[in-house]
């Protein structure tokens, strides 16, 4: 059902030749059985939308379905398109999942063995756990990994940073903890969570902005240690927009209301993104990896401009396959142009979802399903990347920017 705008009648009185004349805009369309030329439906004026429960079947002619309309959850049309299908169960080249969230699988020897079994089935050579671990939690995870003959060269961990109560004395402690975590075996920073810049408060109660100068010593330390910073900023722009039927993510936001960011409670999307971009510019010697393609996979021109202006910026593809796969030509060209600065990552660890990534990246298949209905109601297309680009995406770029990753198990 589409919302339609109420046409407000504006009456103006004018005296012409001694008579009173009333002027009024065209009233809202009323449902009828016939449109222009005798066609079935309801006629509307240019610029108007169809009344609720109707759709435009011809220019300016609306009609409602004869049968009761299904809900958005129940409408699941089956495509009759017959096209080539290339199911890709394993990656063509050994991959590094730079955006791993293995969760409890790193908590025990049995769990980490199970993780390796899953990775083997997908041809994922290595997972970088981006669970914001630090201190004892990080050491415990590394102990489990290093005790496993199968996992010790297959799993690495990023170090977490706590941004709570930033204020006097915070930076010195944060840098010392980061140095200790790297010495313990962490290979970078991350995943810096989306609360950073949205809801995290400083010691004085103010919102912690992404480009706050109190944080500069931490980003400078990352440059000195030669480690990348993996940062997730905010959420898709649609999450900041009104929840109406024109919002492309209406279903997701209705299923998960905690993902909404109303402007009266949170900073605006563009405000947070401006702070992020300023952070990247302020620290040109620090390598930043923007998670989820910076939430600009739906605007590759904007992301391209960022990449051109910020040579220290890299990006990662986790959880934005729905945008990559609906613009195959533009995505193909983007991945080729910036082939040295894009990393593979999956985000949530669901082994059955990885093959969708392989299919989008490796084939030219058309019009196939995405793996989660609530993310996208549209179909995907393969972007058919050439082998040299696939190799950089899957493993070479990660090996290049993360010195702490083992080099074994990859093509020479």
Region locations from a protein language model:
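Bacterial N-terminal signal peptides
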Residues: 6-15
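N-terminal pre-domain segments of enzymes
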Residues: 23-93
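Acidic (Asp/Glu)-rich catalytic clusters
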Residues: 87-89, 115-121, 140-155, 176-186, ...
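Divalent metal-dependent hydrolysis catalytic cores, especially in the metallo-beta-lactamase
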Residues: 95-101, 114-136, 154-162, 187-194
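Histidine-centered divalent metal-coordination motifs
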Residues: 96-103, 232, 292
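Acidic-and-aromatic substrate-binding clefts and catalytic sites of carbohydrate-active enzymes
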Residues: 103-111, 130-140, 164-172, 209, ...
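Active-site gating/metal-coordination segments in enzymes
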Residues: 140-259
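H/E-rich (His + Asp/Glu) clusters that bind or coordinate divalent metals
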Residues: 260-412
């Amino acid at each position: 059902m589409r919302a339609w705008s109420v046409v407000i009648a504006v009456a103006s009185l004018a005296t012409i030749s001694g008579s009173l004349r009333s002027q009024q805009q065209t009233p809202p369309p009323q449902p009828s059985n016939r449109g222009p030329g005798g066609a079935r439906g309801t006629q509307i004026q240019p610029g108007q939308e169809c009344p609720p429960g109707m759709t435009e079947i011809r220019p300016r002619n609306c009609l409602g379905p004869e049968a009761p309309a299904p809900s958005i959850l129940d409408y699941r049309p089956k495509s009759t398109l017959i096209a080539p299908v290339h199911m890709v169960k394993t990656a063509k080249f050994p991959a590094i999942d730079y955006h791993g969230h293995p969760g409890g699988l790193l908590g025990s020897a049995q769990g980490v063995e199970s993780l390796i079994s899953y990775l083997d089935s997908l041809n994922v050579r290595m997972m970088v756990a981006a669970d914001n671990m630090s201190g004892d939690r990080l050491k415990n995870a590394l102990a489990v990994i290093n005790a496993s003959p199968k996992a010790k060269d297959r799993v690495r961990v990023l170090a977490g940073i706590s941004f709570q109560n930033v204020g006097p004395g915070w930076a010195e402690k944060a840098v010392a903890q980061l140095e200790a975590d790297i010495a313990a075996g962490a290979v970078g920073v991350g995943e810096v969570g989306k609360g950073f810049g949205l809801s995290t408060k400083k010691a004085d109660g103010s919102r912690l902005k992404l480009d706050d100068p109190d944080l500069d010593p931490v980003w400078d330390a990352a440059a000195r240690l030669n480690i990348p910073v993996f940062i997730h900023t905010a959420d898709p722009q649609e999450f900041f927009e009104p929840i109406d039927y024109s919002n492309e993510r209406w279903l997701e936001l209705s299923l998960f209301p905690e993902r909404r960011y109303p402007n009266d409670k949170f900073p605006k999307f563009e405000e947070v993104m401006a702070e992020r971009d300023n952070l990247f510019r302020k620290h040109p010697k620090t390598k930043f990896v923007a998670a989820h393609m910076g939430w600009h996979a739906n605007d590759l021109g904007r992301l391209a401009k960022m990449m051109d202006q910020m040579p220290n910026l890299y990006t990662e593809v986790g959880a934005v396959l729905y945008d990559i796969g609906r613009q195959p030509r533009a995505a193909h060209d983007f991945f080729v142009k910036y082939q040295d600065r894009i990393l593979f990552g999956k985000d949530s660890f669901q082994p059955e979802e990885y093959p969708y990534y392989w299919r989008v990246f490796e084939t030219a298949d058309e019009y196939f399903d995405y793996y989660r209905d609530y993310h996208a109601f549209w179909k995907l297309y393969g972007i058919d990347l050439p082998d040299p680009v696939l190799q950089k995406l899957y493993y070479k770029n990660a090996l290049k920017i993360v010195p702490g990753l083992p080099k074994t198990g990859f093509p020479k």
